[in-house]
Each structure stands twice: as structure tokens, then as C-alpha cells.
């Protein structure tokens, strides 16, 4: 049942049709064997009657009612069956099965309507017509709202529930409604407490072994999916598929992706849609192969914030964003009373009240619920802190962190709000402050003047390689690589200590 649950509604309906046809075929073959055996027994009985008629003295008199019944059976046997339609497979008529010992014959219809493509036969012409759509790819039932078409009316009825909000199947755990029972069953497995496949590194549980195998690559770093064009490797096949689209967009020729299908109807549908983009946006002219991507495109950024102009695809996202401007925090913590603007933040905060924190730091005693933040915290203790503050002796692993810390002692605040003039020591503080003013102002370049009067400017990085390779700093007379952010912080620090205040940059967020 597990592979059946993973199918989409259209594939499930096709699977049910094929299984029903197979069942009817087996029943028809079995009934044919029964009818053939009954016909042989009738032939033997007629011969015995003929032999008995030669000796009238010893044979008992016949019942007229039985004679009429037997005659009617013989007349029915001599009557030819109705002719099957032209071009349809003909099956020989089955011999009549008379009542024997009070047992009624089984009513199994003949299957005169055969498919010329695969040879399957059906008792009704309508069944054959519906089956033929598997080979032709015909989809006569179209949705009037989104234009998606289906081969059977039942599939269209199932699809239209998604538009009308008719979702009768509701999850008992979270209350989420679903249009079909199969979707509810697949969703309910996510709530199942039985997660037998557990990761040995972080303890996370999974319902399926394949999900655990995919998760294990996070710890092992395995990347089995390699791009044939540039050699870049990925841990998941879907990531490789998305990456290869970038080659097609940039003009580089990529090897064609071979797509496989489990049903011939899916292949027919794929061939009919390949290379065609009949759905076109009336506003920008962008074309799409199907209606659902066009609907998603129309929804993109349709809900805009009146304060900052930022667009959102959903009204709920806009409502959540509006709390940044209004300061609303409707989600309070029931234990400590702290309030949050988003429910996800409240759930994250609630974990701090739980005692289940198995990962404990041996240096500072801090506890963590999950392994990734614990490992990141441990790296902070293990890192070489060679950048030491001359005032308080505190060490830092990066020069940028030291430069930021130095502002605590110097009182330097290089980030100034262009609207009200308030200054801040960190750019993140300026970002939070500017939200209170409404729309964001454009970013201004980081610049100043050096000792010789030449302008200094933080040059933009052109690639990640330059970001990694072009970073140098002086550490104890030896050149060593540090983050580009450290270089920028050094420049910013020199400008703060050596240059007048009027030359300090006005930074935006």
C-alpha cells in the first residue's frame, strides 16, 4: 500500500481501472471454463436421452413441463448472438448453462469490445472508449477555472474540490483539511510517533529509510549527483536538476535530461506538452506550459505593503510583515510572558523552557537541543583567537569581530541614520532602527579619503572565489587569510580613527 499512497490522484484512478480490468478478465476466463464443462455434461445427457428413446417400454413417461423447458433451452442455444460492432474483437458465444439441482447459472457478461492496441476486452463500449484515452492521451474533461484537463470525469470532480474549498478529510492532529483520503493518509504518517529509522549522529527520526539515507549525507558530506557540464556535485538529485537549468539559462549547452514515466499515458501527456507554452500572462507576456505555473506567476508580489512597498504572494505573508511596522506581537509565551510577532518565533523560544537538551558544552556548560547548533558553538571555543583586544585582553577568531568589539571602548558609531541623524555602532542596529521610519532608503557606498587624499572605496566582490582568495591581513608580521569583512572593518576602523567625522559614510540598510 505504500507505493499506492505516493501516487497522485490521476495515477491512482488509472491504477484502479487497470486492476478492475484485470479482475474482470480473470473472472471471464474462469466462467468460460465453467460453461465449457457444463456444455459437455449437457451433450452427454442428450445422448443418454436418445438411447433411452429406443426403449419406450422401460423409460418412464416425460413431464410436459420439462419438455417445454428443455425445448426452450434448445431454441435459445440455436439462436445466434447479436453481431458485434465492426472492428471489435469477436468472442464465441458461451454455451447456455441449464439449472442443475436448483443452482442458478452465473451472470458474467461477454467482453466483445477489444482494444486494438493492447488486446484488452471490455463488456461495454463506454469502458473501451474510456480505456482508449490511455493510448491516445485524450483529456476531454477540462476545469473551467484553471484549464487543466483530465481523461475521466471523476478525476475532474476530485480536482475541482481544490478550487471550491471542499476538503472533507481533516487531520485529527493538526486540523489541516484535504480533498482526498489518500492525501490525508500520507499527511498523517508525518504525525506518526513511530519513526523507526533514526540517525546515529543527531538522533533525528524518519518514517522511511530513504529519508534517513538522504539525511545522512548532511553528516557525511556525500554528494553523489555530479553535473556533467561543470563537475559540481550535489547531495540530492533535485538540486542537480535545478542547477542544470542554470546552464540552459546562461546559454551553455547541457545534455538533455532523460525523463522516465511509470505509465504510457504520462509519456503521451509529456510529449504533447514538450516544447509548447500555450499559457501566456496578459500583463508581461511570459509563457508557461501549464495553467498552475501561470496562476503562481500572477500571484507573485500581488500584495504590497503600504509602508515600504515590499510585495508578497500571499495576503497572510503581508499581514505577518505588517507587524514589523506596527510592532504588534500577538504570540505571548505562557511561561515567561515574552511576546513574539510570529508563531514560529514563539515555538523556537518555547524550546528554551524544555529540559530536554542532551548536548552540553564541556567548556561553558551551555546546553543545546540539536547537534548542529552545538557543533557550531563548539567551533567558537576551538577556534584560534589570535586577535586580542589591547584594552581588555579579550580574544577573537576574526579581525572583523575585534574591530566591532573595539567600538565598545572607543565609543565609535559609524552607522548614521540619514533621516534623523542617530548613530549606531553596528549595521544591524541601524537596520532595526530604520524600520521605524518606513520605506527603506537606497544604499550609499562605503567611502572616505586616505592619508594621501585619494578616495577609498570598498570594492564589490565579483565572485565567491575572489571573496575567498582575495582576503589578507597582517597578523604578527605574517600575512594570513581572513574574511573580506575583516578587511572592510579595518578600512572602516582606519577611517573612524584617522579621518574627520564629516568623511564618514552614511550607510543604509
From Swiss-Prot:
Gene3D superfamilies (alphabetical): 6.10.140.140, Classic Zinc Finger
Domain of life: Eukaryota
Amino acid composition bias (Basic and acidic residues), ranges on this chain: 41-50, 98-112
Any GO CC annotation of this UniProt entry: nucleus
Region (Disordered) residue spans: 41-114, 428-479
Subcellular location: Nucleus
Gene Ontology terms describing biological process: regulation of transcription by RNA polymerase II
InterPro entries named among the record's database cross-references: KRAB, KRAB_dom_sf, Znf_C2H2_sf, Znf_C2H2_type
UniProt-recorded Gene Ontology molecular function terms: DNA-binding transcription factor activity, RNA polymerase II-specific; RNA polymerase II transcription regulatory region sequence-specific DNA binding; zinc ion binding
Family, as annotated: Belongs to the krueppel C2H2-type zinc-finger protein family.
Protein name: Zinc finger protein CKR1
